[in-house]
């Protein structure tokens, strides 16, 4: 009887392992079969995911999607975008409507452990702040007692604002909206005294207002908001591809490799780690079930992390956001990537 039970358990373990292996590569197989990555993005946030007059999307989150496509197909254009509201985003990922969520989404324990999803890294370290009109004369968020606060529904902001006002013995009236641009319009019309959101989003929304210079972001950052890509939990293979797409961008910046000099660096790698990253030594693409030029393709077609940051939200963009925490670890920030080795 005991031997039979052991045999049954062993057989069940084998079947479970086979099932898990089959499930593990499901997303990559589906993506390769259809020929593109279906990427869930925000419904209109300058600097992160925003469509121009011709319908072309750009932004940090969009560039992550392009990077994944470059890694998988060697072609960053093989991606289709699904704009999603904060309420829609998780359902779209869980249902398989999108392969990847790259939509200024905060990494939290409940989302990572309780919703069947997995965060692959942090593309942008952020924090919640407040946007208000300069005529209000406010210098600090601690002067917002009694304020009416515009908030986007379905975001961490609702909870963090409630916690902040409670901790500081202040009262407020929340007014929620499904879309970020609706919140901005309500603020501009005077329906709210202030708008609460991730600071990066506040800068992005400010440039869409009629007179951006009249609006100020108060100095307080009231929370930690690590924003990053999200995939369905259980597909380790796809998780690794999305994770190492970001790591390739960060490693490239640290090594001084960018979209303009990547061919020169690949022709004469200065270090073994550089040779590994650019596919000149070793067979590291095999671990991801990708071509060994997967990282080269990301850097060549999309750029390193610095290029992506500066053109979308930094010095080369209308937002002019400083790197701050998003600098590399060796330049005063906390961005860091493991080596390809």
Curated annotation (Swiss-Prot):
Physiological role: Probably part of the binding-protein-dependent transport system YdhWXYZ for an amino acid.
GO BP terms in the entry: amino acid transport
Keyword match DNA damage: no
Signal peptide: 1-19
Organism this protein belongs to: Escherichia coli O157:H7
GO cellular component, one term: outer membrane-bounded periplasmic space
Subcellular location: Periplasm
Assigned keywords, A-Z: Amino-acid transport, Periplasm, Signal, Transport
This protein's record includes keyword Heme: no
Chain coiled-coil ranges: none
Name of the protein: Putative amino-acid ABC transporter-binding protein YhdW
One Pfam family linked to the record: SBP_bac_3
Record-stated family: Belongs to the bacterial solute-binding protein 3 family.
């Amino acid at each position: 009887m005991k031997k039979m039970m052991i045999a049954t358990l062993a057989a069940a373990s084998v079947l479970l392992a086979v099932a898990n292996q089959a499930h593990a590569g499901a997303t990559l197989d589906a993506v390769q079969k259809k020929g593109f990555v279906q990427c869930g993005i925000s419904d209109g946030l300058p600097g992160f995911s925003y469509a121009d007059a011709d319908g072309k999307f750009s932004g940090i989150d969009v560039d992550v999607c392009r990077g994944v496509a470059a890694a998988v197909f060697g072609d960053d254009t093989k991606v289709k975008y699904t704009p999603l509201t904060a309420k829609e985003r998780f359902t779209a990922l869980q249902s398989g409507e999108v392969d990847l969520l790259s939509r200024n989404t905060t990494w939290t324990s409940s989302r990572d452990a309780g919703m069947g999803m997995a965060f692959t890294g942090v593309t942008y370290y952020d924090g919640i702040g407040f946007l208000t009109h300069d005529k209000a004369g406010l210098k600090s968020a601690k002067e917002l007692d009694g304020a009416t606060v515009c908030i986007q529904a379905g975001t961490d902001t609702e909870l963090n604002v409630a916690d902040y006002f409670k901790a500081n013995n202040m009262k407020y009236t929340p007014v929620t909206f499904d879309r970020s641009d609706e919140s901005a319009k309500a603020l501009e019309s005077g329906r709210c005294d202030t708008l609460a959101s991730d600071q990066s989003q506040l800068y992005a929304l400010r440039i869409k207002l009629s007179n951006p210079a009249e609006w100020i972001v108060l100095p307080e950052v009231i929370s930690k908001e690590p924003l990053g890509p999200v995939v369905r939990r259980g597909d380790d293979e796809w998780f690794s591809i999305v994770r190492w797409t970001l790591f390739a961008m960060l490693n490239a910046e640290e090594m001084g490799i960018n979209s303009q000099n990547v061919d020169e660096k690949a022709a004469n790698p200065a270090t073994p780690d550089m040779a590994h990253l650019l596919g000149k030594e070793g067979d590291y693409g095999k671990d991801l079930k990708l071509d060994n030029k997967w990282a080269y393709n990301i850097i060549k077609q999309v750029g390193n992390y610095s290029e992506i940051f500066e053109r979308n939200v930094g010095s080369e963009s209308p937002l002019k956001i400083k790197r701050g925490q998003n600098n590399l670890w060796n330049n005063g920030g906390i961005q860091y990537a493991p080596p390809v080795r």
